[in-house]
Amino acid sequence: MLCESEARSTLADPVPMAYLSVDAQGSSEVSLDDITINSSAGTVEVCSMKPADDPKTERSQMNKTGLASSSRPASNVWTTQQDGEVKLRMDEEGMGSEAPKTVHEVFQEAVSKYGDYYALASKKNGQWVKLTYKMYYDKCWKAAKSFLKLVLERFHGVCILGFNSPEWFIADIGAIFAGGLAVGIYTTNSPEACHYVAENCSANILVVENHTQACRKSLEIEHKLPHMKAIIQYGEELKEKRPNQYSWREFLDLGEDIPDSQLREIIESQKPNQCCTLIYTSGTTGQPKGVMLSHDNLTWTSIAAGRSLMLLEATEKQELVVSYLPLSHVAAQMIDIWLPVTFGGQVFFAQPDALKGTLVDTLREVRPTAFLGVPRVWEKIEEKMKSVGAKSSTLRRKVASWAKGVGLQTNLKWMNGHSEVPMNFRLARQLVYKKVRKAIGLDRCTKCFTGAAPISRETLEFFLSLNIPVFELYGMSESSGPHTVSIPQAFRLTSCGKEMAGCRTLIHKPDADGIGEICFAGRHIFMGYLNMEEKTKEAIDKDGWLHSGDLGKCDKDGFIYITGRIKELIITAGGENVPPVPIEDAVKEACPIISNAMLVGDKAKFLAMLLTLKCIINTESGEPGDDLTAEAIEYCQKLGSKATKVSEIISSKDKAVYAAIQAAVSEVNKRAVSNAQKIQKWVVLEKDFSVGGGELGPTMKLKRPVVAQKYKDLIDEFYADANTPTTTEERTSAVMWGGRKLPLVHSIVSLGSLQQIQRVLQK
């Protein structure tokens, strides 16, 4: 990684040649006029053009680089027009010099290499129904022809709303083949949010899973969408027939009279530097932004990520993955759709209630070789394992404790370059680790990943102690998914790894500790935000660097560490910048009964915290209940509390539990770098955060603006007293709220003074 001045000058310094190959069989070409190539440490921009009509003319237009001249070169590395073209960023050698390809070209290669291998597997009536890569491609081709029959216009959206399924994949890729834009919509979106996305991408077609979505969302907004032409329902048969509404079976038959040549002509006109997919951001602070991803964004990133992650091609050993994360998210699309197509992996679809409790059942049945879990998924597995462990015999618990100690120490040594395998580790592997992996379905999994949100060190160490290293990935929608990856050979706890081959990283305006904004460059950088020029200019600077909005640093070995979000930084009234995540994680680690923690105090005189307790989630609705988890109950019992419900703790102001929380907060405060970073007040909320409640996003990421608005009155009460606590006893007294009780919730900490807490802890 270069310093900022070197990095910027490198990107701005062109060199004269691109090393690219052109497929002689009529695939997309690359125009030299559309290329700006920089030195090997910098970037190159590339795009392709339509094949020439006359092969002789085509050859005459080639120069010594093997690139065709273009009459209409792309003029910039970004665009905001859905039919726009961009310069692709290529290197003169290495991973960044790979020839640009369209989605169709990559899929054709997959069929050629992996045609008879299984690609997709979904459960029908309790049995796995599988499609080979040839069958998968044929269905995408049929879907594309049916989209053309429905008069899908070039660069107009096909919105897909539903849980992961073969139909979701086929609709997505079929839309791209047909020249449209594949657009995922979160199933949790309101009709208003669905309308915004569909209108923003000029959607022609809406593909939904079931009758509920068709009626409550699509039909409610259909009349407001001038470009809408049809609604397709794939998860169940139509309950009532409406004009321009089709079942999945009817839809696939629609295009039978569309000649293959018509679709082939559209496919051959596609270029790697054109948009094919839109990923909509969550829009927690405004309307969602449509992240435009090109063919090259998807195809290049998938091969770069796969090689960096050491994925195996199916011809060597087929990778197996479980699809369950929302496909509207770029991480799920890259892991579930594009990486498998590129490397011939087999995708198994989990049940729709996977995140409500059935995921582990699917993992045990499939036994994947690679698995991506967002932090909340890993935390839930951790909680479940701890709950089961708590019910074991004393002997089993002692053996497990010993094995975890051995596992953590051995893996930490491996992480730092040691290679020996101690005898006690081998014994622990036979007695504990193998059984644990089998119990959660990860006994064949050599690649366990986490991403999309910060994960705590405690959770990483828990799995590491069981010989399950969880490797962090880091990126964003605007980088087509991953930018950095962790692998067994390059792994550090709390680091998100090293940049992928062909990618570059810049720490913008680093402070004395080397912490600054993380910026990206490479072929994975998005085209722009659809119809949002100013937002695009804010994201991509004049030198072509994508500003992530994340704060971080890079160590001497090239490992990148994320320290917080610029927008999430709490700036106190005294002007001190406070990253909330490390403080929140520290409180959760210090007090095992805490489920979620959110620090507040922006522009305020001191910090305060909202807390929730670990409770059992309703497997049907996904809503947090009142019953404490087994782990939480065990923790209460150790404290001397008989509580088994959240409401019992809150209504009685359970002294043992509240004192333990305060002790944890005090312990965290002792490690604070300044008084401004100490938690002065806290409150326990009556209900845990959830996707349904709006506090968590589809990937379980905390939506701070939503929480802040939802609990605005309560947060305001934190600061109702204008005086900032200054002494230890005054601070503690402030934490206890002086016995006041608010009407909004009944969980305000009100134990009284510091001495009162100490007496409880001493019992």
From Swiss-Prot:
EC number annotated for this UniProt entry: 6.2.1.3, 6.2.1.15
Amino acid composition bias (Polar residues), ranges on this chain: 62-78
Broad class of where this protein is predominantly found: cytoplasm
Pfam family, one: AMP-binding
Organism superkingdom: Eukaryota
InterPro entries: AMP-binding_CS, AMP-dep_synth/lig_dom, ANL_N_sf
Binding site for ATP: 281-289, 472-477, 550, 565, 678
UniProt-recorded name of the protein: Long-chain-fatty-acid--CoA ligase ACSBG2
Name of the coding gene: ACSBG2
